[in-house]
From Swiss-Prot:
Record organism: Rhizorhabdus wittichii (strain DSM 6014 / CCUG 31198 / JCM 15750 / NBRC 105917 / EY 4224 / RW1)
GO MF terms, alphabetically ordered: structural constituent of ribosome
Alphabetized InterPro entries for the sequence: Ribosomal_bL34, Ribosomal_bL34_CS
Protein name as annotated: Large ribosomal subunit protein bL34
Biased composition, class Basic residues, residue ranges: 31-44
UniProt superkingdom: Bacteria
Single biological process term from Gene Ontology: translation
Recorded GO CC terms: ribonucleoprotein complex; ribosome
Gene: rpmH
Length: 44
């Protein structure tokens, strides 16, 4: 059986990166919440 986590930095950035978060209203909400919480890293 193939394992579920097959690491790839490209896919990681595309799916969870800053630009993909900024692209949708929900993603911007996520960034705002993480800023409000004082997270050092906002996205992958």
């Amino acid at each position: 059986m193939k394992r579920t986590f097959q690491p790839s930095n490209l896919v990681r950035k595309r799916r969870h990166g800053f630009r993909s978060r900024s692209a949708t209203p929900g993603g911007r909400k996520v960034l705002a919440a993480r800023r409000a919480r004082g997270r050092k890293k906002l996205s992958a």
